């Protein structure tokens, strides 16, 4: 974890964010950035995918994402839950890498789906609000099932 501070949002204080990039799912910013979307005061702490931004709502402390800079969608109930979910994801994929790949393609598809189901169950267990259709973790779960993280 890395601690970031923001002079522009002293109410936020110091926040601990995951220190390193996690595939295309998460990349930390070098410095916190303040933004305003939908009348919400947000602090960007990371990136996701090619164009997405991960942000903390200063009022609710929820983690949100935006891909267009004009609307946001829910990711996690808090930065702590986000970090736990991200660590679960990393640990899950690390276990697969250590075990090695499947013998044939059909077996790989079954293993990818089983891995995706474990990811979904883990995310739901950490933050019950985080996994829902068309959400950040939903999209990652489906990418895992398709073998994008194999």
Model-derived segments and their meaning:
Residues 48, 70-74, 111:
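Conserved aromatic-histidine-acidic binding/catalytic patches
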Residues 64-101:
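Compact, glycine/acidic-enriched structural inserts
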Residues 1-68, 116-150:
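A surface-exposed partner-binding patch
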